């Protein structure tokens, strides 16, 4: 029980740490809200990175997606299929591999992306939660290497 509480707190800190700069970044697709953030993995504590087997490096960004069902009270998190690509300004495309992380009532889809300093990416993310909603999420993000 104590281990689950620690994991919950670690995951909560992962999600909350991404919020200050990116609060309110979401799109509505039919009956779901798709929340997204992208940030340097050094924002994670070493403990959180280890707990979820995430690479913590100044040259690695994390893309965090969560899907909420707005047709239900309290907007609960729901499972979805998430895939996508990131294209830099040189036209180099990288396929994003999202990993689902479930913890209590929260569901996160996390992908790692190698970055260089001041690199800008155009993200093209496909999200499908069945009949609740399916569609594309597009956004740009500039990253800075943290050493």
Describe every region a protein language model picked out.
Residues 25-62, 144:
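Beta-strand-rich domain onsets/edges
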Residues 129-136:
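Short acidic/polar inter-strand loop motif in beta-rich domains
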Residues 8-17:
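Sec-dependent N-terminal signal peptides
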Residues 1-8:
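Positively charged n-region of N-terminal signal peptides that target proteins for export
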Residues 99-122:
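Short, solvent-exposed, Trp/other aromatic-anchored flexible loops in extracytoplasmic proteins
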Residues 63-106:
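Mid-chain, structured segments of secreted extracytoplasmic proteins
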Residues 18-22:
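N-terminal signal peptide c-region/cleavage motif recognized by signal peptidases
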Residues 60, 79, 118-122:
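Extracellular Ig-like/FN3 beta-sandwich strand-entry sites
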